[in-house]
Each structure stands twice: as structure tokens, then as C-alpha cells.
């Protein structure tokens, strides 16, 4: 079961919402409806689901409806129509008391504007939500201290917001959201006001926290690079409507339409694709106990000049080259040991391409992709170039 499920969620702003809704059902555009009724389509029949423990990024340009949508999820803005389920419970069925409980304990928000109280210390800012809940002083101080430590601000509790940099203030905002241990974090352009260096630091911080805490995070941004860097799934919006939803790799490889194609045209794909996206299955491998004649026969049949050597469980041992193996055959040597090169370039399945581009450009042999020491695939320059140019790589090739 999904943590959050949204079905046909719609928000129309204005007095003629009913007429606007009827025009919307007829397929009228947002602009036409505005001209005819004066009503604004904030969100247009959005449907999606968010799995527990994932970072789900909603992105789009200004006016796309992304910030309205995130406020519909906790009913800070009431939907015109549609359904929202949280852990299988439909939110529109909740009364005011139940909804307040959801906002207090299940969801927390982090905004672009830090929203810190200048007259409160950092500790008291982080404690604020817990104080409103009526938590006793000792427990909320403990929770605040733990949250500040999580975001790297241990020891700053007695300072005031004016004494902290913008990046540090945003960490305080994140700590405040984490203090009541919510299941879900709603982050609306949380890092957009920061300079590029601080923004990257906060992205790293968020990913580190996610490794530890496994929160369900809905992250709003207009920055595609940010979305691709942190998102498990990305939903792109335009004029209140959902244009495409998918993993970063799916969106880059299969853009839904021209709008998405234009959106992603300047993306540095090397920062998004990982080794697993561009590796191919090796045509042949040679087992460690197989001798030079077997290895040479396999290379000749496959038309390759080298072959990786593995144990029976596919644990990588090294690589041998045809010229050196041929020499062993001529000398009637029955072991590959003297021709075996154990120091081969390797990488993990989840390594971003950007981190191995230097190796790819300088090595004369394929890069071995391993998991727990076992050979999973190989990376050749051709597969990398295909991926970076937007062509799909066949991992079974």
C-alpha cells in the first residue's frame, strides 16, 4: 500500500468554481477558463502515489501548481474535488480535530522562507511545534537537541537566528520539522533561496538524513538538476496538470512530450545515470580454472581481444588479453596465472557516471561493474556515449 495516494485532485480558485469545473471537463485550457470565468485552475485532476521512505519530487516552472498541490496534501488549502489517502485513510473524511492531529504528528513542512522567530533561541525555535502540542519542557528540549545534532548544528542551540548563515538557518527549519518525528516531510522550495554551494550542502544533508531515517519526503522544486539529484521519482507539472511521472532515468530516457524534452535538453546526464544504467552484459567470461586454450577459443569465437576471469560464483578475479594468452598456448603453459591482470578498473552499480568519466576516458579495457565482488556487467565507451546522447542502452547486449 502506498504511503500517499492522490486521485483526480483538483483546486479551482475563484467564485465561479462550478462553471470552471464544467469547462475543465470539456477540455478547455487554463487560459480560456480564466478569460471566461475569472477562475484560476491551481491543480487539474492530479493523480499519483508516493511510496513509504522515498523522496518524491514535484517540479515545474512558476505557476505550474506544484506549491498549491503540496498544500492540498495537508489541507492547508481545501481541494475543489478529488481524493487524498494517507496510509489508506481518506483525508476529506477527517474532522477538524483529526486533521489537526495529522498535521501535528504525521506531516511537517519546510518552507523556502525559514520562518524562524528572531526573538527565540535556536533551541526554542526547534521546540516550538512541540511546545504547541503541550509536550513537557524536558522532553521537548531533548527532542530539539537530537534534531539539531541530526542536521549538524549540535552546540548552536543557545544562539539566535541572526547569528547563523542562511544555510544554517535552513538547517534549523529542517530540524524543527524533524523534531516531532513525522512520517512525512513536505518541503516547498526548501533550498531555493540558498546560494549554489549551500544548496548542494543541504541536498547532501537531506540525502544523509534519508539514509538514516527513511522518511517519506515530498520535495517541491523548479530546479531540474536538484530534482534529478535527490528524487527517487519525479513528477513534472505544467499549468496545474501532471505531465509525466517516473524515475530520473525514465524521464531522461523517455520524455513524455516536447515540453519534457525541452525541459531536460540541457541536463548533464552523467550526474544522473549510474553504472547500472550504462553497463552491458559481457559476451563471454572465462572461469578461473579454465586454461589458456579455452580462454583463447572463447575470445576468438566472440571476436574480442580480452576476457574477464571469474570464479564459479562470478566473483571477479581479473582480465586476460588474447596476445598474452596466445603466447602461453604456444609455450604449452596450462595455467593463465602469468597472463592474469588482477588490477582492473571496477565500479559499483550505483556509482554516478560523472565519478568514473576520467577512468572511462583513459582506460583501454572495459570497466568491471561489481556487487559484493561479483561481476554484474561491463562498461565500454560506446554504451556511455549512447547514454549521454540520449539513446537507450541495452544492458543485455
Swiss-Prot record:
The annotated consequence of gene deletion is:
Mutants are impaired in the transport of glycine betaine at elevated osmolarity and at decreased temperature.
Query: What general EC class does the enzyme of this chain belong to?
Result: translocase
Residues the entry annotates as binding ATP: 60-67
A single Gene Ontology CC term: membrane
One Gene Ontology BP term is: response to cold
Q: Which Pfam families match?
A: ABC_tran (PF00005), CBS (PF00571)
Gene Ontology molecular function terms on file = ABC-type glycine betaine transporter activity; ATP binding; ATP hydrolysis activity; carnitine transmembrane transporter activity
InterPro entries attached to this UniProt entry: AAA+_ATPase, ABC_osmolyte_uptake_ATP-bind, ABC_transporter-like_ATP-bd, ABC_transporter-like_CS, CBS_dom, CBS_dom_sf, Gly-betaine_transp_ATP-bd, P-loop_NTPase
Residue span(s) of domain CBS: 279-335, 340-395
List UniProt keywords, sorted A-Z. Answer: Amino-acid transport, ATP-binding, CBS domain, Nucleotide-binding, Repeat, Stress response, Translocase, Transport
Summarize what activates or inhibits it.
The complex is activated by an osmotic gradient or by low temperature.
The answer, when asked if Amino-acid biosynthesis is one of the entry's keywords, is: no
Q: Which reaction does it catalyse?
A: a quaternary ammonium(out) + ATP + H2O = a quaternary ammonium(in) + ADP + phosphate + H(+)
Would I find Repeat among this entry's keywords?
yes
EC id: 7.6.2.9
What this chain does, per the entry, is described as: Part of the ABC transporter complex GbuABC involved in glycine betaine uptake. Responsible for energy coupling to the transport system. Involved, with BetL and OpuC, in osmoprotection and cryoprotection of Listeria. Can also uptake carnitine when carnitine is abundant in the growth medium.
Assembly notes: The complex is composed of two ATP-binding proteins (GbuA), two transmembrane proteins (GbuB) and a solute-binding protein (GbuC).
* Family the entry assigns: Belongs to the ABC transporter superfamily.
Protein name per UniProt:
Glycine betaine/carnitine transport ATP-binding protein GbuA
Per the UniProt record, the source organism is: Listeria monocytogenes serotype 1/2a (strain 10403S)
Gene (name only): gbuA
Amino acid at each position: 500500500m502506498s504511503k500517499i495516494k492522490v486521485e483526480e485532485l483538483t483546486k479551482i480558485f475563484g467564485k465561479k468554481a462550478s462553471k470552471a469545473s464544467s469547462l475543465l471537463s470539456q477540455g478547455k485550457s487554463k487560459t480560456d477558463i480564466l478569460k471566461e470565468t475569472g477562475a484560476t485552475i491551481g491543480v487539474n485532476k492530479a493523480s499519483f502515489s508516493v511510496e513509504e521512505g522515498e523522496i518524491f519530487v514535484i517540479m515545474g516552472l512558476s505557476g505550474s501548481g506544484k506549491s498549491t498541490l503540496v498544500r492540498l496534501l495537508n489541507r492547508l488549502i481545501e481541494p475543489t474535488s478529488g481524493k487524498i489517502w494517507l496510509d489508506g485513510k481518506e483525508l476529506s473524511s477527517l474532522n477538524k480535530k483529526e486533521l489537526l492531529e495529522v498535521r501535528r504528528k504525521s506531516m511537517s513542512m519546510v518552507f523556502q522562507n525559514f520562518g524562524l522567530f528572531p526573538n527565540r533561541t535556536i533551541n526554542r525555535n526547534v521546540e516550538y511545534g512541540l511546545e504547541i502540542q503541550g509536550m513537557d519542557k524536558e522532553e521537548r528540549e531533548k527532542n530539539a537537541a537530537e534534531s539539531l545534532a541530526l542536521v549538524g548544528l549540535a552546540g548552536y542551540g543557545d544562539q539566535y537566528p541572526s547569528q547563523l548563515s542562511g544555510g544554517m538557518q535552513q538547517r534549523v527549519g529542517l530540524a524543527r520539522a524533524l523534531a516531532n518525528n513525522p512520517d512525512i516531510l513536505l518541503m516547498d522550495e526548501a533550498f531555493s533561496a540558498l546560494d549554489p554551494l549551500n544548496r548542494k550542502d543541504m541536498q547532501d544533508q537531506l540525502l544523509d538524513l534519508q539514509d538514516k531515517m527513511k522518511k517519506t519526503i515530498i520535495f517541491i522544486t523548479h530546479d531540474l538538476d536538484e530534482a534529478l539529484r535527490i528524487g527517487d521519482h519525479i513528477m513534472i507539472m505544467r499549468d496545474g496538470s501532471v505531465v509525466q511521472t517516473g524515475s530520473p532515468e525514465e524521464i531522461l530516457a523517455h520524455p513524455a512530450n516536447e515540453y519534457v524534452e525541452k525541459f531536460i535538453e540541457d541536463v548533464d546526464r552523467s550526474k544522473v545515470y549510474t553504472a547500472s544504467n550504462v553497463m552491458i552484459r559481457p559476451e563471454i567470461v572465462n572461469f578461473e580454472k579454465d586454461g589458456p586454450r579455452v580462454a583463447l577459443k572463447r575470445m576468438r569465437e566472440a571476436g574480442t581481444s580480452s576476457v574477464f576471469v571469474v570464479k564459479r560464483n562470478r566473483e571477479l578475479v581479473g582480465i586476460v588479453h588474447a596476445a598474452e594468452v596466445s603466447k602461453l598456448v604456444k609455450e604449452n603453459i596450462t595455467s593463465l596465472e602469468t597472463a592474469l591482470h588482477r588490477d582492473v578498473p571496477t565500479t559499483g552499480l550505483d556509482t554516478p557516471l560523472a565519478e568514473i568519466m576520467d577512468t572511462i576516458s583513459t582506460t583501454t579495457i572495459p570497466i568491471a561493474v561489481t556487487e559484493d565482488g561479483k561481476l554484474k556487467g561491463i562498461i565500454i565507451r560506446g554504451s556511455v556515449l549512447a547514454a549521454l546522447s540520449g539513446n537507450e542502452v541495452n544492458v543485455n547486449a
